[in-house]
């Protein structure tokens, strides 16, 4: 069989016609400029927003800007090794992270890679870190309580599984302490925890990890650390990495608690990125999409129906204010996104009230739906009593002659604040909280001097622990509505304890109208 020259010629012409000389150029680009953790790359015409690219030094970058002649890439690591003219390769993949139970008890960086020296994570399952939040029909009502172990929160600002509750306040007012106590209180409650540290000091995170280990909390906790020394892109990515890991557990029917500490620094990292990418600045130099930055993150916290796994993600974002100003840009944004806020104030903290929560400004929009019936019943008037106390206290400063009712409100309010004081790492279970709240409601603290209130609380818990009749009622008190018979039994037990406590502590009851008490002066 002979081959004609004309056939060969036509085949070659066809192949030349079909040959695409631009295909390779679109996959491999070149660095135009590099600096401050940002590289501008030409030639990646088909790059997608959020896509990973690989530099010559095998480090990754994240495409954040798509412009006419170049793309803006955030460098994840090794920016000092990059120079103009180096090649950049597309991966065709968006950024994703390993997920699964292997991550429990580990300390990871912002990309989900282990930094605790305990070996690599061998899980093969991954999830994209930028996901759409669950839709309306996917969600379930938030009505299962998430116990914090903090009486002030569980009684007046209850948090439900699937809720987003903001912890907001000035620096050094105990915001992280509230989040840490909540994580520690999840022991034996079948809740997995994720602590995301954004822009914190490495020494602070080391202390937090050690405290979690000391309280056996690392057995159900994952720590993600993107410290202040790391590049802004890693700080920007970290919370999305955390919620992606949480979503895998939620899809498997598990309840997850995630803490973002803190979103103020996250917003600053994003502002840094945006300014370096030459995006137009807006209010306080933040870019126009800073609201979406946090709404897309926090909306991923939910309690979903069984068809979508039946699990939940409860988010506790932390935001730092300046001089108590909650009307600043980032605080108001996040307040409007979340389902309530816990507001910590410096004056309360310095006065010794721990946790330093301002009850007047703090609110939970889920409310009593996320409380056990006993606490819902016994704490129903607590917030009102404290509001009356604060109002009367303000007026009492202007005059010395106070009537009996006003005096009683002041004394009772002072004792309530004292009994609500809680030192860090000492959570109280909801069963004992219910007993304490009943004692407050029935005025069974009125005969106890303020100085003895905290001792009264700890002794009451010990007394109940040794009362087999009340301990037998624990399953009912923790889950069911309390009937009058059970309530009377509890009141009788508390009254018995009060008599015992008064005798043991040499307290004399003043028979006057104010029912005041004083110590016996022993010579």
Curated annotation (Swiss-Prot):
It catalyses: ATP + H2O + 4 H(+)(in) = ADP + phosphate + 5 H(+)(out). InterPro entries: ATP_synth_asu-like_sf, ATP_synth_asu_C, ATP_synth_asu_C_sf, ATP_synth_F1_a_nt-bd_dom, ATP_synth_F1_asu, ATPase_a/bsu_AS, ATPase_F1/V1/A1_a/bsu_N, ATPase_F1/V1/A1_a/bsu_N_sf. The record marks 362 as: Required for activity. Its main location: membrane. It comes from the Bacteria. It is a peripheral membrane protein. GO terms for molecular function: ADP binding; ATP binding; proton-transporting ATP synthase activity, rotational mechanism. It is an enzyme of class 7 (translocase). ATP binds at residues 169-176. It is found in: Cell membrane. Its EC number is 7.1.2.2. The keyword Transport applies. Disulfide bonds: none annotated. GO terms for cellular component: plasma membrane; proton-transporting ATP synthase complex. Keywords: ATP synthesis, ATP-binding, Cell membrane, CF(1), Hydrogen ion transport, Ion transport, Membrane, Nucleotide-binding, Translocase, Transport. F-type ATPases have 2 components, CF(1) - the catalytic core - and CF(0) - the membrane proton channel. CF(1) has five subunits: alpha(3), beta(3), gamma(1), delta(1), epsilon(1). CF(0) has three main subunits: a(1), b(2) and c(9-12). The alpha and beta chains form an alternating ring which encloses part of the gamma chain. CF(1) is attached to CF(0) by a central stalk formed by the gamma and epsilon chains, while a peripheral stalk is formed by the delta and b chains. Produces ATP from ADP in the presence of a proton gradient across the membrane. The alpha chain is a regulatory subunit. Belongs to the ATPase alpha/beta chains family. This is ATP synthase subunit alpha. It comes from Mycoplasma mobile (strain ATCC 43663 / 163K / NCTC 11711) (Mesomycoplasma mobile). The gene is atpA.
């Amino acid at each position: 069989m002979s081959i004609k020259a004309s056939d060969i010629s036509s085949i070659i012409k066809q192949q030349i016609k079909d040959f695409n000389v631009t295909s390779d150029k679109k996959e491999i680009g070149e660095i135009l400029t590099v600096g401050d953790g940002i590289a501008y790359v030409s030639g990646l015409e088909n790059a997608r927003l959020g896509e990973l690219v690989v530099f010559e030094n095998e480090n990754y970058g994240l495409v954040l800007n798509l412009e006419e002649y170049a793309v803006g890439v955030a460098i994840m690591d090794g920016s000092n090794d990059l120079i103009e003219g180096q090649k950049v390769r597309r991966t065709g993949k968006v950024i994703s992270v390993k997920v699964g139970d292997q991550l429990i008890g580990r300390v990871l960086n912002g990309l989900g890679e282990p930094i605790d020296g305990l070996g690599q994570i061998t899980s093969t399952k991954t999830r994209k870190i930028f996901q759409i939040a669950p839709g309306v029909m996917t969600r379930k009502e938030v009505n299962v309580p998430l116990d914090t172990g903090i009486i002030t929160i569980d009684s007046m600002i209850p948090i439900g599984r699937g809720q987003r509750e903001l912890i907001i306040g000035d620096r050094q007012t105990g915001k992280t302490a509230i989040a840490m106590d909540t994580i520690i209180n999840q022991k034996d409650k079948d809740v997995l925890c994720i602590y995301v540290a954004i822009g914190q000091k490495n020494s602070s995170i080391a202390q937090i990890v050690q405290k979690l280990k000391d309280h056996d909390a690392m057995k159900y906790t994952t720590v993600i650390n993107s410290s202040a020394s790391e590049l802004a892109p890693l700080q920007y990515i970290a919370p999305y990495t955390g919620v992606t890991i949480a979503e895998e557990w939620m899809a498997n029917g598990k309840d997850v608690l995630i803490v973002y500490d803190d979103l103020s620094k996250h917003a600053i990292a994003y502002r840094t990125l945006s300014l370096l990418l030459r995006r137009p600045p807006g209010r306080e130099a933040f870019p126009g999409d800073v609201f979406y930055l946090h709404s897309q993150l926090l909306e991923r916290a939910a309690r979903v129906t069984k068809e979508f796994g039946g699990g939940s993600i409860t988010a506790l974002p932390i935001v730092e204010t300046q001089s108590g100003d909650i009307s600043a840009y980032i605080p108001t944004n996040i307040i409007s996104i979340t389902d309530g806020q816990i507001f910590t104030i410096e004056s309360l903290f310095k006065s010794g009230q721990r946790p330093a929560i301002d009850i007047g400004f703090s609110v939970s929009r889920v409310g009593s739906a996320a409380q056990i019936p006993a606490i819902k019943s016994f704490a129903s008037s607590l917030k009102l009593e404290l509001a009356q106390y604060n109002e009367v206290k303000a007026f009492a400063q202007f005059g010395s002659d106070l009537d009996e009712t006003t005096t009683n409100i002041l004394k009772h309010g002072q004792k309530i604040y004292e009994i609500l004081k809680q030192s860090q790492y000492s959570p109280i279970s909801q069963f004992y909280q219910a007993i304490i709240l009943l004692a407050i409601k029935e005025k069974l603290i009125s005969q106890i001097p303020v100085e003895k209130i905290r001792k009264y609380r700890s002794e009451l818990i010990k007394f109940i622990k040794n009362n087999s009749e009340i301990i037998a009622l624990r399953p009912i008190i923790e889950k069911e509505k309390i009937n009058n018979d059970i309530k009377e039994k509890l009141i009788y037990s508390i009254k018995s304890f009060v008599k015992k406590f008064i005798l043991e502590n040499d307290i004399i009851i003043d028979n006057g109208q104010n029912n005041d008490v004083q110590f016996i002066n022993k010579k």
